Amino acid sequence: MSLEKVDRLVEQAKSIILESSNPDRTSLWRAYVALEYAILDLKLRHGLEGNPPPKPVKSADLVTAKSMIGRLNLSSSSDKKKLLYDLRLCRDIVKALVASKLR
């Protein structure tokens, strides 16, 4: 099975996070939703769950988010469980960024 939809969603989140020096709350929320949808698509299409999600991130900065999301590479990812874990970690970092914009 291909990962076209997941790839498209991850690229959407990457473009929001990587191309902006200071993304606003709405843009970060869009990136979060794209990552969440990619996670759901990957889980449902490939029947993945098994491993528990990573511990929630308490605080994050834009540099960490850019670093994590920049390392996502779906074309070389043959281990879908690792990809799911990485997507969840990126999602949690973006979620922490959205929360920090509320303060």
Predicted stretch roles:
Residues 1, 46, 102-103:
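Short intrinsically disordered terminal tails
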Residues 1-35, 87, 91-96:
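Short terminal alpha-helical segments
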Residues 5, 14, 43, 55-58, ...:
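Context-gated lysine
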Residues 17-64:
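Amphipathic alpha-helical interaction modules
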Residues 63-103:
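Amphipathic alpha-helical binding modules
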